[in-house]
Amino acid sequence: YSSAASDVYKRQEYCRLAGLFPEAEVVNGTPLIRQARSVKTPVEIEMFRRSGIAHAKAYEQIPGVYRPGMTDIEFSIEIERLMRLQGCLGIFRVFGRSMEIFMGSVLTGDNAGYPSPYDFALGGQGLDPALPGGANKTPLKEGQSVMVDLGGNFNGYMNDMSRVFSIGKLPEEAYTAHQVCLDIQEKIASIARPGIACEVLYDTAVEVVKAAGFADKFMGTGQQAKFIGHGIGLEINEAPVLAPRIKQQLEPGMVFALEPKIVIPGVGPVGIENSWVVTNEGIEKLTNCNEEIIELS
């Protein structure tokens, strides 16, 4: 047998490889390759740790680049600059050919609930239909939240982290919803361990958000993402996927992003996203910086 990732290679490349092994039966190797890549080596995990430290250092400087009167895209550009100066490579790699974005997204107000054709937790309209995702020149307004969600590619391995900022004070509902997301993170961190199925972690998050009364705003409003986490690695969307009916079990060495988020209409997104590594006993956070809503001034 000869294995090739048929959903990654172009037809021309696929046919060329098949021609090199005329006696072999070419089969789709994507599932095997993705399964192998879902468990990282100690060297790879160390790369994630270093990336997480650099990512956090950039995020800690975000309040210093805010200026009153900014739009979301102006704010995004300044944050991207912080990331690049910290060593970010500035490229966001994804699996497959149907999803693309620059370095991530900065979403504020109702743009956070804008439907997207991409499989993101939150989409955004973007600057043009040619790339429908992220900031759309929305002014940063008093009483609205801003979610910064940039992929941290500092050494080829993609960290993922989201933090929330506010322009002035937010309605109390937003702070309550943000705490619900932190509670989901804490609950999942307490039960996640090798052997637990991804669907159990997703169902646990849904139970918490339903009990809190935010199910209709969880992971979006009109278009709600049906996952709360995803594997990360050389690409931002690797296995495992924390989603309903996913029987795959966590294994030591897996690295994933957990991102419970809620969108409050008229206010914007709240929630949290961190990168985690599965250990022999549970999971360990790789992206560490302030998780509360930070007021900008």
Question: What do the PLM-derived regions correspond to, one by one?
Answer:
Residues L20, A24-V43:
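A short, charged helix-loop
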Residues R11-P22:
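Short, aromatic/basic amphipathic alpha-helical patches
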Residues H55-Q144, I191-G233:
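Active-site cores enriched in adjacent His and Asp/Glu residues with nearby glycine-rich loops
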Residues P139-E186, L234-S297:
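Charged, cofactor-coupling segments
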Residues P42, D183-R193:
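Amphipathic alpha-helix from the class-I
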Residues Y1-A5, Y9:
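Single conserved hydrophobic/aromatic residue that forms the stacking wall/gate
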